Amino acid sequence: MQLTNLADVDTNLETTDHLTKGMLEGALPDKRFRRHITDAVVEVINSEPDSELRRVFRDNTLTYAAVLSTGKYSLAAYVNAVKFVSLKLMGDKSSTAYSKVFPDRYQNLIDKGASGSYIASFADNYSKTGLITKIMEQTMVPTHILNAG
């Protein structure tokens, strides 16, 4: 069997690791969220200085957007939750992920002289919220897919 030459296909190569409003708009499950897409929401992802980590945040934000249709969550809360889950999946402890996602809250606790275990309790509490739990459920790969092949 001989293969014939196929015409070159113009592909849209990924040239950026930044999230755009258009990308987010296309991933959202419902039109009601689209009006809440602001520069500030997009900047939560794009402000990450490490381009590889920024790419992970962007991809996960686009991948898990269906979670928004399962409850009453704000877009900003969703983006922060995705960052938190992404950091946890990459090996950060809850308190470390919490400090990266909410640096102002973390610094406020430090300024008040909170102990490490006290701060960890806030992070642990956040990790058990409904939104975080639903995003974590989305990250789980079914066993039949893992064992396929």
Stretch-by-stretch model annotation:
Residues 1-147:
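N-terminal, charge-rich alpha-helical recognition modules
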